[in-house]
């Protein structure tokens, strides 16, 4: 495991930033994927591992070895209570074990983020949602939206760490449409807390180079290449966040990058009604 101290304090000027952004190279819907650039220079602190392109990863290929190495390294760091930077289907994110209270506190300190703002929970399978949430929608609805660039907010179960978002009975669930993140969540075997890899109030990150200020304070950075076109504002919107905690209704908490498709499924296929005050 890396000897980096992921919970070391940021410089005072860095720690002052406060704000909200959604956490998290793979299939990015609506954004053009670019070829990965040359590897970024390593900074003191974080270990950087470059992912092979997912299309090249086959059972006995050299690329599979690199993919497996990155998975094992990330799981080891997460189980040790560290914070790891990861690519998702929307943005680069910071992940930690949702069951490790010290790691959760570390994420807030790293980002300069108010602890009144919740972290999402990343899972690897739709079946896992039922363990951590009180689900009041058909399973088919979950399967239509997951994996994908959405965060579904539901009532949390007693299985989740009480130090995770203790101020709310709800939790946002992510199952990213990204091969590495699906493998990581399944191999880790528990809930991952996930947020965007940026200082609060700053722009979200589409490449590892865009959050280099955080590298020295992380144990591991997984470089999956650019997620989308850095010149496109749409590619920085993050996931579409939907409240499904009220039976028969949905509320759009954040429009995100998949609003049109998400609302079409919720209303057109399942007949859910927009809740009062929804930004849809």
UniProtKB/Swiss-Prot annotation:
What membrane topology is given?
Peripheral membrane protein
What this protein catalyses is: L-threonine + hydrogencarbonate + ATP = L-threonylcarbamoyladenylate + diphosphate + H2O
Q: Which InterPro entries match?
A: DHBP_synth_RibB-like_a/b_dom, Sua5-like_dom, TC-AMP_synthase_SUA5
Q: Which residues does the Swiss-Prot or TrEMBL entry list as transit peptide?
A: 1-56
- Alphabetical keyword list: Cell membrane, Cytoplasm, Membrane, Mitochondrion, Phosphoprotein, Transferase, Transit peptide
Enzyme class name: transferase
Q: Per its UniProt record, what Pfam families does this chain match?
A: Sua5_yciO_yrdC (PF01300)
- Per UniProt, residues of the YrdC-like domain are 68-258
- NCBIfam families (UniProt xref): L-threonylcarbamoyladenylate synthase
According to its record, what is known about the domains?
The mitochondrial targeting sequence (MTS) is weak and only mediates import of a small fraction of YRDC in mitochondria.
What does the protein in this record do?
Answer: Cytoplasmic and mitochondrial threonylcarbamoyl-AMP synthase required for the formation of a threonylcarbamoyl group on adenosine at position 37 (t(6)A37) in tRNAs that read codons beginning with adenine. Catalyzes the conversion of L-threonine, HCO(3)(-)/CO(2) and ATP to give threonylcarbamoyl-AMP (TC-AMP) as the acyladenylate intermediate, with the release of diphosphate. Participates in t(6)A37 formation in cytoplasmic and mitochondrial tRNAs. May regulate the activity of some transporters.
Protein name, as recorded:
Threonylcarbamoyl-AMP synthase
Species this chain originates from: Rattus norvegicus (Rat)
